[in-house]
């Protein structure tokens, strides 16, 4: 689209240039769509740097799960989520750490947003390899009739990680690898 703006926001003090260098190498024609503002989801005043009333806006909450509630409340109370036809919120898993916390977060979402404003996602399912499973299963006329319980006796899923917990230690301390990888990623791939 011609009128697209992707704004990174963080409590960390960055300039647009320092933020772009932190992201890595991207083509200039992509980078001109990027901007950066420093703000704090816990401080409504600092959120005012985010607002653009003329645009359809999606807020991707790339924050620790325990901050989702406060982020939603402050974005709503600052007036950013008032137009359900033009504002969205993306919440990445985990959506709570157990049934009680998931129900609580759902009550917050229901109180401050309309359901059509909310996207709950798992970034892992967007990976090329995972998407290729479906393409291979349903898009290959040779394999499609054979890919069923009559011809497949066993399914093995290997999740090999090349990265450690770098930058994710706090998340893993609260979520744990079983919650992060097994119950979300691996079971969704299996299904």
What are these regions (language model features)?
Residues 1-90, 95-191:
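Secretory/organelle targeting and membrane-embedding segments
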